[in-house]
Amino acid sequence: EFYVGHNAEDALDRLIRNFVSRMDEERMTQVEESSYSLQEIITIASLIEEETDGTDQANIASVIYNRLEGSGNKQGTYGLLQIDASLLYALPDHTGPITSADMQTDSPYNLYQNAGLPPTPISNPGLASIDAALNPNSTDYYYYALGTDGKHHFSTTLAEHNAFVNSSSYGG
């Protein structure tokens, strides 16, 4: 809780204490044993948080790691995460679907143009997204898209992904 009379420093201190209390020893050990820094894990978790309604975080995490770490051209992704939520972070007044012009936006948060992670988290992720970033599913997925059923559909290859996107099941 925040009270009248609390300043920004009080609020920040409370947020930090809350974060530290939730990032327990087990989670911190997982971070230390990973090849990613705490900031990178939280950045990945923030991408997961903004990309899903909470039903498929571990699969979204798998796609992110596969694109970051995959071999060769990473199934045609070349290390580009191509995450809409990060682009929308760079375009806070954007409405409607993302266009090809939007994908040309000059911003470090445009993961259609910049390989790897954005420079900072794009949101404050919940524990479920942090846990997914620490424990992604082991898959060969490199792509996902939202279906008309409201669920993400995952693909291993660009051909599979394009077939889904061009089907009547694609939800945009």
Predicted regions and their residues:
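Bacterial extracytoplasmic/cell-wall-associated proteins, especially those involved in peptidoglycan
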Residues: 1-172
